[in-house]
Amino acid sequence: MKFSNISEYYFNSDNVTGYLSDFSKYNHEIDSIKLHEETIKKNEITSDVDVNNFEPIVLSLYPNKILNNESKNFETSELILLDGHHRWKYANQINLVNKLKCILVNFKDVKVKSYFFKINIEKDKFIKHLSEAGYIPNNDGNIGIYFEDEMYINKKVKNIFDLYNFKKLIQDDNVITPILEDGGESSTFVKFTSLKPQDLLSIDHLLPPKSTWITPRI
């Protein structure tokens, strides 16, 4: 896909420079946009919404591509969607992806954090739930679940995607719910080991909603 009329866009809160353009040259048969997260059904865009009025979606280039302030035209067939999954899904449904505005960022500027979750069952029952799934307190692990100043790990979990498969199960069962408003940190919140930006390159399925807080974002 070719991008022209590129202009700089500065993300003040992240101290990152992105590059504003649009998807007017998008070709679904050639261009690959990698998604990483499911949408929230209640937040999905339904109808009678003008795609032209959408805020730009934010996408990352792959590591082998670099944009800078001298770039006036740019071409790539692969991008990673960072922010704007609901807008992307709606534009796809009505075949108006070419009307989307976008901001492209370099892969080196991408940062990933984990959302906090609240538990919807009693603490003792939640800890028992973890134990029955093989998660026990152990602060020596690299991949696990943080709760009440303890890290719970499962020695059978070999990678971050196994952990997030378990997260999907308990999220789908309403054992945990993402905290969408910034309420600060609390030991009673649940947090999962964050993905690394490199994980976005290898992921081959959609994570459950609100698995990642990726910056820069609008």
Q: What is each model feature region?
A:
Residues 64, 72-218:
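Basic- and aromatic-enriched surface patches that contact anionic nucleotides/nucleic acids
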Residues 1-80, 86, 92, 96-99, ...:
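Short alpha-helix boundary/capping and kink motifs at helix termini
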